């Protein structure tokens, strides 16, 4: 909360600037001289008109502004940003969804949808949960798992693509992709992750970027995103309230035989171990629920699991003792 208080005034001025660049439809649209950028792509990305990825990110930014306004006690700002976000969100599907393509199109120019479909707006809309479950599943098939859609070749943006798949329960497929893509860099001799990686390139092609033969960064922080995915979607640790005052833990093996890891929080570490029969969870501070998928009632050393639905249980954790759970897949 203290950190948000420090940043909030600058967040407001930034959002005021963005709001000042919206068109008559309330959507952000590039002006002459603007560099509209989402990713380095090995193909043509049209930047004309209203871009779907830009509106989805703009909407999420307004929602985040409302959340931060609430944290700092700015009730007027909260109401303002909530209204702006809700208004824009209501326009996303009517503007960009194409039933024939079963996806968001890339842009709308002069009131007409383009024929192009790219991954960006579609994957963002999935893990922002801007679409219903049926349309999210449609996007998985028509976009995320469709090799004919322009591929993403930067580790940073691949992270969002894989997060969308994780959000759809595809951890096993994502694990294979992480091993192939980030593992591909390691096989090329990488000791740190690169700014851009195209598995189809060979030799010194991997070093070229920006029109220069050795222009690529081979130690790029934005390439480290598997760490986030492993913590959130495999170890399953997420904040429920600001600063992890309350947490949720929902481990998923995702094709692994076992896993073990620690997620640091402001209140201390949350340690998770899981194999096909056992979970071990230890949270040094804070409180929250551990979700357990089990055909039969799980056995635990501390506490009593509560049945949430068929095959799903949860255990409340409010002390630092290790919880040991035996479950049945």
Give the location of each predicted region.
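Active-site acid/base region of carbohydrate-active enzymes
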Residues: 1-54, 72-122, 188, 244
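Well-ordered alpha-helical scaffold segments within catalytic/enzyme domains
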Residues: 1-3, 57-75, 123-133, 160-169, ...
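Extracytoplasmic/secreted proteins, especially bacterial periplasmic and envelope-associated proteins
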Residues: 6, 10-17, 57-60, 64, ...
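Flexible glycine/proline-rich, aromatic-decorated loop/lid segments
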Residues: 25-41, 135-143, 182-185, 189-203
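Aromatic- and carboxylate-enriched substrate-binding clefts and catalytic-loop regions
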Residues: 31-35, 47, 118-121, 153-156, ...
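Solvent-exposed loop and edge beta-strand segments that line ligand/cofactor-binding
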Residues: 41-57, 101-122, 128, 141-158, ...
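Repeat-solenoid scaffold signature
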Residues: 149-188, 204
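Non-catalytic C-terminal accessory modules of carbohydrate-active enzymes
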Residues: 175-329
């Amino acid at each position: 909360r203290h950190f948000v208080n420090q940043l909030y005034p600058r967040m407001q001025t930034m959002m005021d600037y963005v709001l000042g660049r919206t068109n008559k439809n309330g959507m952000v649209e590039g002006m002459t001289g603007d560099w509209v950028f989402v990713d380095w792509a090995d193909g043509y990305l049209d930047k004309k008109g209203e871009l779907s990825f830009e509106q989805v990110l703009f909407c999420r930014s307004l929602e985040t502004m409302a959340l931060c306004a609430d944290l700092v006690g700015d009730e007027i700002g909260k109401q303002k940003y909530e209204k702006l976000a809700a208004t824009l969100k209501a326009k996303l599907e009517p503007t960009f969804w194409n039933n024939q393509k079963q996806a968001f199109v890339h842009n709308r120019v002069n009131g007409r949808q383009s024929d192009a479909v790219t991954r960006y707006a579609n994957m963002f809309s999935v893990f922002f949960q801007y679409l219903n479950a049926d349309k999210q599943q449609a996007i998985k098939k028509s976009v995320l798992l469709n090799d004919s859609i322009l591929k993403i070749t930067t580790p940073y943006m691949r992270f969002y693509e894989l997060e969308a798949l994780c959000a759809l329960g595809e951890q096993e497929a994502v694990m294979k992709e992480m091993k192939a893509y980030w593992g591909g860099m390691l096989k090329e001799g990488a000791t740190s992750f690169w700014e851009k990686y195209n598995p189809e390139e060979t030799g010194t092609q991997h070093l070229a970027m920006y029109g220069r033969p050795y222009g690529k960064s081979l130690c790029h922080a934005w390439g480290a995103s598997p760490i986030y995915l492993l913590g959130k979607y495999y170890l399953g640790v997420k904040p429920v309230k600001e600063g992890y005052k309350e947490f949720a833990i929902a481990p998923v093996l995702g094709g692994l035989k076992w896993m073990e890891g620690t997620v640091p929080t402001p209140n201390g570490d949350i340690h998770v171990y899981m194999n096909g029969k056992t979970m071990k969870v230890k949270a040094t501070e804070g409180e929250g629920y551990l979700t357990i998928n089990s055909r039969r009632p799980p056995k635990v050393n501390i506490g009593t699991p509560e049945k949430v639905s068929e095959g799903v249980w949860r255990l409340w954790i409010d002390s630092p003792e290790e919880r040991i759970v035996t479950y049945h897949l």
